[in-house]
Amino acid sequence: YGFFIFYNASPDYAQQIPANGSNQTRGLVTWTETKILGQAAYQYSVNIYDDKARLIQVKSKNQTGGADLITTQYSWSGQPLVMLQKQIKSGANAQTSFTVTKFIYDDLGRVLRTDKKIQHTNVGGNVLPSVYTTVSQVEYDALGQLKQKTVGSKKNPANNTYYSPRQPLQEQAYEYNIRGWLLNVNKGYMNNANTNQYFAMELGYDKNASLSTFAPLYNGNIAGMLWKSEGDQQRRKYNFSYDAANRLTAGAFAQYVSGSGSSAVFNISANIDYSVSGLTYDANGNLKTMTQKGLILNASPTIDQFTYNYKNTEYSNKLAKVTDSAAAASSGKLGDFKDGNVGATDDYSYDVNGNLTADLNKGISAISYN
């Protein structure tokens, strides 16, 4: 454990790392080797356990010929308390980095805060900082639901030190309805600027979001969603439709134009449309058709128009073929699904156990299993 000895103290409610791993490892994975195709070398990994069968250290060989080590110290109740990660880069420009992660829990065993220290050969004189930096902190409501999460810590540009008391880089606030369903994330940011929030989202069930009118649904289905991101500050939404079996049939996309509250106007006048429509299903609930629009050079044509066929003349749940009839799909440059097997031949093949043995859309003609 060498490098970890200096950190093997006894913080509150913690157990020290044992000097040696346990020999009682029956039924536990202690060693793995992974073959790298085209090379003679293997990548190996060794697992070390304590006498309670808890994984206390993993040592593995990395692609540089160096080693990655992860050592974990547990609390008396078995929760990870401190984790030390050591990465050694061998060869040219050899480097070593340490990352120490500390977890703080409340009386109910829930993670409240995650702190880190980082040391690197080429940074800050290769010295481990004396204090931790908080990377995330969470707060729960009386029902145990996540109420607020803060991420990162800001530095004072005047002296390049972290603010005290801490100022987070980002804040995330969560609200729920009486059933515990998520209603929104950062609702205040939807209509106002906030330097510590970069994303907002609202979900509509039986009630509207703050800037949109959704047809209310009383069966738990999400009637629509509204969101806003930091990049362009634009507010966008989807209105969802379902069939009698509560299966999604369409998602109508629109962008905010003007107005407020239930009078807010959303449309696709900016020629941006990511709507999904025409979702149909077979008797087994398998998807049969789907149409999707997307943005191409300031226009939003249909980029996907799928038809799904299944094995055994549709009397199966095994997908046989996907046909894309959209005109925009012929270029194959959109980064989405590519219909790489045009014709009557099935796209997908399976063995007797149901394992995929061919995917002609991706140019994979054979897959074998041991």
What are these regions (language model features)?
Residues G2-D50, L55-N370:
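Acidic/glycine-rich beta-solenoid
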